[in-house]
Amino acid sequence: MLADSLKVLLATSYVFSIKAQNFHWNVEGQNFPQYHDFFGELYSEVYDNTIDRCAEFIRALDSYTPGSMARFAELSVIEEQTKIPRAELMVAELFENNTKMIELLNEIFPIANEQNQGIANFIAERIDAHGKHGWMLRSILKKNRE
């Protein structure tokens, strides 16, 4: 059911956004300003362009949105982070989570494409956005070429 898939997307996006925001607040060490800015842009982009739109699509499908942290944690395909890892590990974790997000979006797309073109367009936009996030995260993780 499309609404159920969107609930998983909503929960996963929320957990991803909160994790990036947590890292934005708590990152330390060398290159702090760059990490701080990047994590801030990442959580803002996901929050601003996914959360409310996804919830509204769920409601438009005559279903109710999950609305508690417990329910988001239960539905999400990624886990929350309760510790403060080193900056490099923050990036690696977000890269792994972003990859799972892309996989989820790719699972939802054919369902949406069959049932609702507006939602399919939204999912396609999110695939593109998370593809860009993946490129940036992967580039940060690469060792300098010599």
Regions found by a protein language model. Name each.
Residues 1, 16-42, 104-119:
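Helix-loop segments that flank and shape redox-cofactor active sites
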Residues 5-6, 56, 74-128:
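Acidic/histidine-rich alpha-helical segments that form the ligand environment
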Residues 9:
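Glycine-rich anion/phosphate-binding loop at the beta-strand->alpha-helix junction
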Residues 12-23, 49-50, 97-105, 133:
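Amphipathic, well-ordered alpha-helical segments in soluble domains
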Residues 27, 57-58, 65, 109-112, ...:
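Leucine-rich amphipathic alpha-helices with coiled-coil/heptad-repeat character
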Residues 31-69:
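Conserved alpha-helical segments that form or flank metal/cofactor-binding pockets of metalloenzymes
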Residues 59-71, 94-97, 143-146:
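Short alpha-helical linear motifs
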Residues 120-146:
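Short, contiguous alpha-helical
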